[in-house]
Design a protein with these regions (language model features):
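Helical cap/lid subdomain of alpha/beta-hydrolase-fold lipid enzymes
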Residues: 28, 192-327
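Residue-level marker of motif borders
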Residues: 78, 112, 176, 257-259, ...
Length: 327
């Protein structure tokens, strides 16, 4: 579905560029090259305005940034440009044309990796991470979370099916999950429903473990489940997130590594990505979409995967529970 929608969005943008170019060409009597250039700049300005709006909204819900993670004006501008380019690349190329969900995998002597994307994305989001994984000899699989606006609990069975398939095809009895944004919550929903017997590690990138104020402006049941109401100090997560938090024991939390940025422009408060009992790793100067595209994050994820490969088998596993409702 996301693949189709992003292709339709590209077609609409192309039509808009041609319409603006024609208006400039015949209304202002510029040449076609100039008219097309102006039309393209208009498109870039609109897309950049969307990115600016995300940062403005995130600022309203921001958490305090530790001194060592603060940015000067130049570093912030560089981060904004990187996030804008990451968003353009992801929505205009990776998600429309590079989807690779459920691709078959080979047998592996080491634990394989399951990639879970976030809200409004598909498996194409992970395209830039494929080369580092291939170079490291990692066997991996990605899934698409659909329906796009569904209850996050409904993604649990999709994750379960992918885990079973990945174990069967790789010949391993456990997997490592790497999840971006809402994908981390889908992984937590899966663990609550199915237990952690088949999971060696969960590495989340910019996941709103306690919600995000930006979700208040989004559509779908999954957005409502990711709500954060109020400011960073006095606000509160959704009922669903609170119940999810209460359902997890220490053994489950110890499986998690939460990687996040203090300048995340979608997850705000940014410290919402911190998960008690987990290993929390903070970065600065990286936006939300850029997390899975940045070489520094690639290196960190690879380090955590290699660390999970060296872990001994768990002594105790948690058991499955019933899905959480908002009642």
């Amino acid at each position: 579905m996301v693949e189709r929608l992003t292709r339709q969005l590209l077609a609409f943008q192309l039509a808009a560029v041609l319409a603006v170019a024609a208006s400039v060409r015949f209304g202002l009597h510029y040449g076609w090259h100039t008219a097309l250039g102006i039309a393209f700049l208009v498109l870039v300005a609109v897309r950049m305005g969307i990115s600016i709006n995300n940062f403005v909204l995130a600022w309203q819900y921001r958490s305090d940034t530790p001194r060592e993670y603060r940015l000067n004006a130049w570093l912030f501008l560089r981060m904004f440009c990187m996030e804008f380019l990451a968003s353009m690349w992801t929505t205009s190329w990776a998600m429309p044309f590079k989807r690779f969900a459920n691709a078959p995998v080979n047998k592996s002597e080491r634990l394989p990796v399951l990639l879970i994307h976030g809200y409004g994305c598909n498996s194409g989001y992970w395209h830039r991470m494929r080369r580092p994984f291939d170079d490291a000899g990692i066997v991996y699989r990605a899934i698409d979370l659909e329906p796009v606006f569904a209850d996050i609990e409904a993604y649990g069975p999709l994750v379960a099916q992918a885990v079973e398939a990945l174990c069967r095809e790789s010949g391993q009895d456990r997997v490592i999950i790497v999840a971006h944004s809402m994908g981390g919550l889908a992984a937590r929903a899966y663990l609550r429903q199915c237990g952690n017997q088949q999971i060696a590690r969960v590495i989340t990138l910019g996941s709103p473990h306690h919600g995000t104020g930006i979700a208040n402006f989004g559509a779908g049941m999954n957005c409502r489940q990711m709500h954060w109401r109020g400011n960073a100090k006095t606000g509160a997560p959704s009922i669903w997130l609170r119940k999810l938090d209460e359902s997890e024991d220490q053994a489950t939390r110890e499986l998690f590594v939460s990687i996040y940025s203090h300048q995340d422009n979608i997850v705000a408060p940014q410290i919402s990505s911190q998960l008690a009992g987990a290993r929390n790793i903070a970065f600065r100067g990286i936006g939300h979409v850029a997390l899975a595209l940045h070489p520094v994050i690639h290196a960190c994820v690879l380090d955590e995967i290699r660390a999970a490969w060296a872990l001994p088998l768990p002594e105790k596993a948690s058991h499955a529970e019933q899905p959480i409702t908002e009642n």
